[in-house]
A protein has these predicted regions:
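Flexible loop/hinge segments that line or gate small-molecule binding clefts
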Residues: 97, 118-164, 185, 205-206, ...
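N-terminal helix-turn-helix DNA-binding module of bacterial transcription factors
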Residues: 1-57, 351
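Amphipathic helical "hinge" segments at domain boundaries
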Residues: 44-107, 112-115, 194, 201, ...
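Flexible loop/turn connectors
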Residues: 227-352
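Short, solvent-exposed amphipathic alpha-helices that sit
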Residues: 71-86, 161-165, 187-206, 221, ...
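An alpha-beta-alpha
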Residues: 163-203, 210, 313-328
Length: 352
């Protein structure tokens, strides 16, 4: 049996070859269901190389992430992959938290891919510019650059996440609250800190400066930051940790120091994962939908590639929510109001 051609599909449905071609390229056309059925019945397989030569496209979309071992980025890539469907293949580039590798990778992508979904390492990164990219479509996800007004972005509501975490701990009676932050040079690190500090300020709580630890979004960084907190003469009674990998490291440090969660210290992490429910005790977290962020980024990018979206760049915000489990306990039962007032005063004195 000879191999089916695009002409065979068009003849079976009763449409032009150009209509079938547009359908295969992802455009909305009439008789889409009939075309899809005919392609399946005839086992038609488009010649991708020939099609790309004709359209001037590569059929590839690059997804650039800083650390693929982070479950959040793995889920984000999967969401983008599903949204791309059969039209595009994903070229995954893991920069390994290396700025030089990030610059190298972005330069090599020009002319090799049809678009880029990009998670930059730092807001101040100079790896890209409108001039260097030319007309290559790009969508930021999770993080943006300070000079990125010309590009679309899909971001979680990080400020709200930091605010929800701090507010929950305050409502449980905590006042000596520590914060293990990601790099303040990154969008999520900076915005989660803004939300956290806003919640404390609204309730008149002055944070001991020693309770703030800027880290690097890695497990080792979380371990080192928590170890530093545990070395203090007056330890915090609660901690918000600004990403999943740092939370793993921080929990390891707590275990090594025989600190009981939540009896000795309440813990809130950022990003939900299957293991969050398996940790003992199950982890309270700020949750966001990584699949959705990846899918929205891909959908936005495809609109740009196809020329459907001619509007100015847009920023899409994805909601976050607090998932309460058992790592914070029900109340800060081990501290009286008098003790809380004393620790607030002590924290204020430490700042002077």
């Amino acid at each position: 049996m000879s191999k089916a051609t695009i002409s065979d599909v068009a003849r079976k449905v009763g449409v032009s070859e150009s209509t079938v071609s547009r359908f295969i390229s992802g455009y909305k056309v009439r008789n889409a269901k009939r075309i899809s059925r005919a392609i399946k019945d005839l086992d038609y397989r488009p010649n991708i190389v020939a099609r790309n030569l004709k359209t001037g496209r590569t059929g590839l979309i690059a997804v650039v992430v800083p650390d693929i071992t982070n479950p959040f980025f793995a889920s984000l890539v999967r969401g983008a992959e599903i949204a791309a469907g059969d039209e595009y293949m994903i070229q995954l580039i893991n920069t390994g938290d290396d700025l030089e590798r990030e610059k190298w990778a972005l330069k090599r992508m020009i002319g090799r891919v049809d678009g880029v979904i990009y998670v930059p390492l730092q807001e101040s990164s100079e790896a890209i510019s409108n001039k260097s990219l030319g007309s290559l479509p790009l969508v930021f996800v999770d993080r943006v650059l300070t000079k990125s007004n010309g590009f679309d972005s899909v971001l979680a509501d990080n400020c709200q996440g930091g605010f929800l975490a701090a507010s929950h701990l305050i409502e449980l009676g905590h006042r000596a609250i520590a914060f293990i932050s990601g790099p303040l040079s990154s969008t999520p690190g900076r915005e989660r800190a803004i939300g956290f500090n806003k919640a404390l300020a609204e309730r008149g709580i002055v944070q001991n400066s020693q309770y703030f630890r800027e880290s690097d979004f890695t497990s080792l960084g979380g371990y080192q930051a928590m170890s530093g907190l545990l070395s203090l003469k007056v330890r915090p009674t609660a901690v918000f940790i600004a990403n999943n990998l740092m939370t793993i490291g921080a929990l390891k440090a707590l275990k090594e120091h025989r600190i009981s969660v939540p009896e000795d210290m309440a813990v809130i992490g950022f990003d939900d994962h299957e293991i969050s429910d398996l940790i003992d005790p199950p982890l309270t977290v700020i949750s966001r939908d990584a699949h959705l962020q990846g899918a929205l980024a891909m959908a936005t990018l495809l609109e740009r590639i196809r020329g459907i979206n001619q509007f100015p760049p847009k920023q899409i915000k994805v909601d976050v929510n607090l998932v309460v489990r058992k790592s914070c306990g029900s109340t800060c039962h081990h501290r009286s109001n008098e003790e809380a007032k004393f620790e607030d005063t002590l924290s204020a004195l430490t700042l002077t």
